[in-house]
Amino acid sequence: MRGIFSTGVLDAFYDHQYRPFDFCLGVSAGSTNLAAWLAHQRGRNYKVITDYSCRPQFISFKRFMLGRHWLDLDWLWEITIREVRLDLERFADQPIPLFVVTTKVADGQAAYIRATAQNLEHLLKASCSVPIVYRDFTVIDGEQMTDGGVADSIPVIKAYEMGARDITVILSRPDGYRKKRPRSPWLLRRILSKTPRLAEAMITRDMRYNRSIDFIENPPEGCRIRVIAPSNGFAVGRMTTDAAKLKAGYEMGLQAARSLF
């Protein structure tokens, strides 16, 4: 649900016709927001987050305790494709490449896959598939994939390696946030005993996240990084369904982006 902030940022970009980018890298909810923005669908993801994602058919701890999904992405993808589908034709017709970050279940490494009209919806589902709370893995090109945020939450170093020297980063945490190591790594290893490399990637996620923050705070010579992040008053967490908090998070994103103009 923290993706509501970048929803606001990108809707503001849309309002100002701000599209100066050579390419985009998206992770988890951020990838879905970028896809809607590139497809010129202002407001689409605001509805997805504040309506569909808040319904008990999608988010249910009781269902999780019964051995099923806490976050049912199968239901969410099916209903949003039916009722508020991304405009795949318009996405394909625009010139800015989108690379979606996923995590390979077999080895816990990041994959950066270029989105097309043919693979977009499947890629986005893979990148949003948070391990444990969504009990399945999405298969891309014969390989099981999961949440891109596990392997590379902030792909700023990858953007630099791809040649970017003027980089805009949209964060879902306040500026200065540092990720901490999980308190119970043994529990993750136990829950994910069938996928040990993925378990280790989740346990060491803080190292990669904080390395990206270090890169942002101390970019190489000749590299400019602009950060758009929520303020410390951002009250939206992964499971937030409170309408007022979600609306405030969206407005915060709108305002943060508008300050650029």
What residue spans do the PLM features occupy?
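Patatin-like phospholipase
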Residues: M1-V27, A35-F261
